[in-house]
Amino acid sequence: MARILGIDPGSRITGYGLIETNNKKTVYIAAGCIRAGEGGLAERLGQIFQGITGIIQAYHPDEVAVEQVFMHQNPGSALKLGQARGAAICAAVNAVLPIFEYTPSQVKQAVVGRGDAAKSQVQYMIRLLLKLPAEPATDAADALACALCHEHAGPLLAGLAGQVRGRRRGRYYR
């Protein structure tokens, strides 16, 4: 059984989502957003670090999946997004958790079936796949999608690392 923390980093709003999988069933645990205040960038990065640290301490994930930075038209925005990712990754590294990174198109492909899917399509599919009563907030849905992407890619990554111990009904397990 693995508990996966998905993170959708942002300099103002960072989404997080937790799922638990036991090779047969994927269960929703929690999701939400860390809203960094209106302070300076350093203060917001500290809030992201502390927020992710608190989530890790509360839910004890086994692995972390983080969405990679995509190129913005504005280089300043891309740099701030990269710094927000760094704060979230540092929180996971500080907790000695394995970190896996996925591009936005990989995440969308895993959840919707199209790498160019709209955010509303991601929200809709997350609601269906995890049997949620309502669509989660955009950033939380992206984080849950990142966790689901890792859940789908996990057996492949484990096989590449030589960690696969067996196969049961078409799915690998550790």
Swiss-Prot record:
Q: Does the keyword Magnesium apply?
A: yes
Q: Which UniProt keywords apply?
A: Cytoplasm, DNA damage, DNA recombination, DNA repair, DNA-binding, Endonuclease, Hydrolase, Magnesium, Metal-binding, Nuclease
Q: Where does Mg(2+) 1 bind?
A: 8, 139
**Positions with a binding annotation for Mg(2+) 2:** 67
**Reactions catalysed, as given in the entry:** Endonucleolytic cleavage at a junction such as a reciprocal single-stranded crossover between two homologous DNA duplexes (Holliday junction)
A biological process (GO) of this protein is: DNA recombination
What EC numbers are recorded for this enzyme?
Answer: 3.1.21.10
One GO cellular-component annotation of the UniProt record comes to: cytoplasm
Q: Matching CDD domains, A to Z?
A: RuvC
Question: What binding details are noted for the cofactor?
Answer: Binds 2 Mg(2+) ion per subunit.
An example of a GO molecular function for this protein is: crossover junction DNA endonuclease activity
**Could you name the active-site residues?**
8, 67, 139
Q: Where is this protein found?
A: Cytoplasm
Give the cofactors, semicolon-separated.
Mg(2+)
Note the Pfam families from the entry.
RuvC
InterPro entries, from UniProt? RNaseH-like_sf, RNaseH_sf, X-over_junc_endoDNase_Mg_BS, X-over_junc_endoDNase_RuvC
Q: Which family does it belong to?
A: Belongs to the RuvC family.
**Tell me, how does this one assemble?**
Homodimer which binds Holliday junction (HJ) DNA. The HJ becomes 2-fold symmetrical on binding to RuvC with unstacked arms; it has a different conformation from HJ DNA in complex with RuvA. In the full resolvosome a probable DNA-RuvA(4)-RuvB(12)-RuvC(2) complex forms which resolves the HJ.
Q: What does this protein do?
A: The RuvA-RuvB-RuvC complex processes Holliday junction (HJ) DNA during genetic recombination and DNA repair. Endonuclease that resolves HJ intermediates. Cleaves cruciform DNA by making single-stranded nicks across the HJ at symmetrical positions within the homologous arms, yielding a 5'-phosphate and a 3'-hydroxyl group; requires a central core of homology in the junction. The consensus cleavage sequence is 5'-(A/T)TT(C/G)-3'. Cleavage occurs on the 3'-side of the TT dinucleotide at the point of strand exchange.
Q: What is this protein called?
A: Crossover junction endodeoxyribonuclease RuvC
